[in-house]
């Protein structure tokens, strides 16, 4: 049983690493001059995106190979976004455009070099993320972040209403009448 578990862990690790490098290889081949190579690469690229539940258009401007420590599972990057060199992007990250014309955050994000984006983070709208920025897990960024900054979530707040508290204590369900 332990040997199966070890094999599964090794396979999972290799698959995650392989999918990230395979993603990069297909991404560059999808823009190849030869139409047959381009067609094959785009077909495989779309299959890789579907298999991982990801959405990273091959036309997205990415300056250098980003690091995907947990693979590209659930990563969505808008086509208009720009990502600098040496970025670390964890799973379930969304880097999306705001397409509501006239809104404050209209546009696509621009991310500098050496940026760390924690799992579940959302970067939305025409924001600029400076170089050497660290964005914590599950942060929602809708404003510009200066260089050498760290973005973290606000401390959680617990909101209790007296009526809700009484229901919890009595464990009674009120009638819908």
Which sequence ranges carry the predicted segments?
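Terminal amphipathic alpha-helical/low-complexity segments used for targeting or macromolecular assembly
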Residues: 1-53, 163-177
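Short, flexible active-site loops
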Residues: 27, 70-71
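Left-handed beta-helix
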Residues: 52, 58, 63-65, 69-70, ...
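A short beta-to-alpha transition loop/helix N-cap that caps and shapes the active-site region
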Residues: 158-162
